């Protein structure tokens, strides 16, 4: 009944930190059992630097149609929330497995390093194969340009994580990339080793100034 649900929520709200800790512990235990039962089909089966578990971080806008707690105007001129989510990538044959989500008001910044660090830590705590602070390259964190901050990348480096992070190009960077010699470019390949049509990669270490 509604009164029962209301009383339960009130009870849980009395000690939010303890309740969230218990819920996250239960979720991690359930995931460990599920991945163990999946055997070779588990996301962490045979995970190493060449075949890492990939965690995707991305924020999304959730609309609210009335005045709700933490609902605020968004950068897209909407009204609602801006949670930051973490999903384990199950590959082309599967879907994303949610492992962490940080609830945020609609006006939360897209590239807030502290939020990306918080969600990454919560996501790693949900993985059965991550113990200790230095996780290693068996886990790769993937984000769009919202994760392209020095503070967040320094955190990933300290934890020895692999990462693939987008970054917005400035006019100067675009010119420097355009001036690369043809032999600097090599074909890009997808996860199955198939060459991607029209896609090329180049090593930019020492080419771009990333100190800003």
Residues of each region from the PLM?
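Short, basic/hydrophobic alpha-helical segments
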Residues: 34-44, 117-139
């Amino acid at each position: 009944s509604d009164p029962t649900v209301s009383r339960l929520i009130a009870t849980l709200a009395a000690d939010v930190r303890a309740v969230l800790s218990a819920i996250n512990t239960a979720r991690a235990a359930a995931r460990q059992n599920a991945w163990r039962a999946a055997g070779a089909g588990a996301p962490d089966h045979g995970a190493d630097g060449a075949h890492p578990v990939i965690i995707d971080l991305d924020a999304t806008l959730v609309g609210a149609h009335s005045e709700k707690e933490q609902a605020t105007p968004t950068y897209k001129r909407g009204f609602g929330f801006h949670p930051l989510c973490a999903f384990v990538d199950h590959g082309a044959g599967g879907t994303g497995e949610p492992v962490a989500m940080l609830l945020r008001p609609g006006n939360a910044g897209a590239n807030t390093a502290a939020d990306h660090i918080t969600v990454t830590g919560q996501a790693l705590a949900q993985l059965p194969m991550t113990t200790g602070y230095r996780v290693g390259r068996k886990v790769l964190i993937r984000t769009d340009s919202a994760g392209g901050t020095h503070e967040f990348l320094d955190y990933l480096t300290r934890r020895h994580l692999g990462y693939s992070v987008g970054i917005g190009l400035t006019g100067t960077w675009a010119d420097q990339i355009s001036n690369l010699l043809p032999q600097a470019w090599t074909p890009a390949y997808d996860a199955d080793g198939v060459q991607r049509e029209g896609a090329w990669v180049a090593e930019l270490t020492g080419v771009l100034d990333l100190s800003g």
